[in-house]
């Protein structure tokens, strides 16, 4: 699998602290090895067909599509409570 960043994703990522960005990159490494890695808690995002969400930490999620052997990272944002 490979990762592709959708337009604007990296700009959204820059809004977070270096600590959060490091956590994000760690989670992406888990994603590349195993979509079902326990710390990702990856699941289909219920409001949009075909879009998945995974955890960076308790409060931050990233959203992605799976097309063939590519993860397309769409957005990263604070999870609403």
Language model features with spans:
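Intrinsically disordered regions, especially transient/low-confidence alpha-helical propensity segments
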Residues: 1-2, 49
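Enriched for short, Lys/Arg-rich terminal
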Residues: 2-7, 11, 18, 22, ...
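N-terminal first-folded block
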Residues: 8-39
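A short, surface-exposed loop/turn module that caps and links secondary-structure elements
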Residues: 30-54
């Amino acid at each position: 699998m490979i990762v592709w960043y959708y337009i604007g994703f990296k700009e959204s990522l820059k809004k977070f602290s270096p600590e959060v960005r490091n956590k994000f990159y760690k989670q992406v490494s888990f994603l590349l090895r195993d979509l079902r890695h326990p710390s990702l808690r990856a699941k289909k995002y219920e409001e949009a067909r075909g879009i998945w969400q995974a955890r960076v930490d308790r409060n931050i999620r990233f959203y992605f599509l799976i097309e063939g052997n590519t993860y397309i990272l769409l957005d990263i944002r604070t999870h609403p409570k």
